[in-house]
Structures are given as structure tokens and as C-alpha cells.
């Protein structure tokens, strides 16, 4: 049995003459925290809506939780926090969650316990019986997150979940996502905050002009590490010898050399070699490429997330 909870091939969507999504081909595994990255207008939100069958594709195909797109029973097992949502602002957070719970077929003490647990988890229990018209943007966002988790979903779509949240609110969302991972829940995360994605996700896909153009596993997709060594004496023989341990070797100052190595496992042998040949090693500094740097490299300098 396949462990894929999302599997799509060639999904396309037109809005009039505009091709919003040209080729959405994705595979997301069970229990994965999957980041969906791209510049504004890349088709990310439209892609999510197609996966949720809120928008019907004009081409291609896909399956969610093993069922074709649009399967009604599948929807009951999925949670969704949209980027833009509108609540009935005359209702309290508790009333809103009760309303959404009934849409899922929940009722009675089970629903009440779920509501109390989620309101406490998103730090809204004290404000639960106030109309949401008086809520701040961050409080509304946390209400939306509670709604997305109300049915105890096996797959959750979070579209800009930290929008409007202060640093403590963003930390709370990150903690909740970690808890979902520990429970085996799959999270499909769309966010322009690359630092949050890098701290949270297992794997990411880059989308540009409606196409999936690159995927990478975070923490494993860096095929090299930049290394800066402060060493003396630094001469031509030493520079030549370093080529046995890495590439892209360049001298930046009188006692600093920069190079690329395949992994940290190279460092012990490299350090021993330097010491054995009589060099004085004053410092070794590793630097991995950040997700933002990968984003700019894949997308182009003019396509920073916004």
C-alpha cells in the first residue's frame, strides 16, 4: 500500500486566458511536513484549492489520501486553514467551533471537549465566549488554526498560518506543527516566511509560474558545505594540498582560505593533515546554504518571496 497522502501529475488550471497552474506534479508522504514555496502569483493557493476540490482542475489528475480529487469522504479527514477567511463575527470562538464541528458530524461532549482542548492549545480559552468581531488579527488566525484541527485530521493544509502573528504566536504555531508530526499527521504548509519553513519542514517544493521546478529534503539536499579556515603559514603548497579534501579553494586574506567540502566528515582528516604538515590552525567555520539562498538560486534574484 502506498504511503503517499498526496500524489498529483500535471494538474493545470486556467482562469480565462491566464494559466494559473501549468504543471503541478507532487508526491507527499504520510507524516511529512511539506513546504510549498514560491513568489506571489506562482499558483500556490490555487494549487491548494485544487487539492481540496474547492477549484476543479482543467487538466491532469491527482489523489489525496488514496482517493481521487473531490472524494467526499476524504474531506472529512482533512483540515484547512485558508490564507484569507471570513468568520461570522457575531459569533464567539466557541460558537464558531461548535458550528464547524457539526459540519463534520461531531456533537455532544466529544465536540465540547475537543473545542476546550483546542481553544486552550491556541491560547484563546479566556476569550472563547467573546464575539470574534473584537478579536485581533492574531486571535482570528489562532481561531482559524483551531478550526483546521477540530476534526482531528490526518492531513492539514495551512496557507500562511503565521500571518498576523507576533513572535510568540509564530512559536506557538511551530510547536503545534511539531506536535502534529509526532502524531503522524501530514502537514502541507504554504508560507513566505522561509525561516519558519526551514525550522519546521522536512521537505519543500519550489513553484514558479504555475510549475513545480525543484524539490529538496531540508538538511540533506546541500551537496556541499562552505568552509573557512584561518591558518598560518598559508602558502602555495598548502593551497595545493587542500584540493585533496575539497574544491573551490580560494585565499581571501593572508591567513584565511575558503573551500567547499562534501560533508562535516571531511573535517577530522583535514585538520590532522594541516597539523601534521606544521600549520597553525586558528579557526574552522562551517556555513550551510540557507533556504532563502536556495530560494533565490532556484527562482532568480527577482523572485524573492513576498
Predicted regions: what is each one?
Residues 173-261:
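ABC transporter nucleotide-binding domain
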Residues 15, 28, 191, 233, ...:
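Conserved residues at beta->alpha junctions
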Amino acid at each position: 500500500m502506498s504511503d503517499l497522502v498526496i500524489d498529483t501529475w500535471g494538474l493545470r488550471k486556467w482562469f480565462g486566458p491566464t494559466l494559473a497552474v501549468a504543471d503541478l506534479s507532487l508526491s507527499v508522504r504520510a507524516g511529512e511536513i511539506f513546504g510549498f514555496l514560491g513568489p506571489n502569483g506562482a499558483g500556490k493557493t490555487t494549487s491548494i484549492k485544487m487539492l481540496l476540490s474547492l477549484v476543479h482542475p482543467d487538466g491532469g489528475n491527482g489523489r489525496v489520501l488514496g482517493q481521487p480529487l473531490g472524494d467526499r469522504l476524504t474531506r472529512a479527514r482533512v483540515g484547512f486553514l485558508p490564507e484569507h477567511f471570513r468568520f461570522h463575527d457575531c459569533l464567539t470562538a466557541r460558537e464558531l467551533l461548535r458550528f464547524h464541528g457539526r459540519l463534520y458530524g461531531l456533537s455532544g461532549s466529544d465536540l465540547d471537549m475537543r473545542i476546550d482542548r483546542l481553544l486552550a492549545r491556541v491560547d484563546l480559552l479566556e476569550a472563547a465566549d467573546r464575539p470574534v468581531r473584537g478579536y485581533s488579527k492574531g486571535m482570528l488566525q489562532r481561531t482559524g488554526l483551531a478550526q483546521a484541527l477540530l476534526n482531528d485530521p490526518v492531513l492539514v493544509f495551512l496557507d500562511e498560518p503565521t500571518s498576523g502573528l507576533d513572535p510568540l504566536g509564530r512559536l506557538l504555531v511551530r510547536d503545534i506543527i511539531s506536535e502534529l508530526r509526532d502524531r503522524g499527521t501530514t502537514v502541507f504548509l504554504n508560507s513566505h516566511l522561509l525561516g519558519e519553513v526551514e525550522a519546521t519542514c522536512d521537505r519543500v517544493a519550489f513553484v514558479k509560474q504555475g510549475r513545480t521546478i525543484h524539490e529538496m529534503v531540508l538538511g540533506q539536499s546541500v551537496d556541499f558545505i562552505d568552509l573557512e579556515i584561518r591558518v598560518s603559514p598559508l602558502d602555495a603548497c598548502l593551497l595545493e594540498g587542500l584540493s585533496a579534501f575539497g574544491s573551490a579553494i580560494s585565499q581571501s586574506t593572508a591567513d584565511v582560505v575558503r573551500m567547499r567540502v562534501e560533508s562535516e566528515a571531511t573535517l577530522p582528516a583535514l585538520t590532522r593533515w594541516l597539523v601534521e604538515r606544521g600549520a597553525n590552525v586558528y579557526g574552522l567555520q562551517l556555513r550551510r546554504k540557507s533556504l532563502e539562498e536556495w530560494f533565490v538560486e532556484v527562482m532568480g534574484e527577482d523572485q524573492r518571496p513576498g
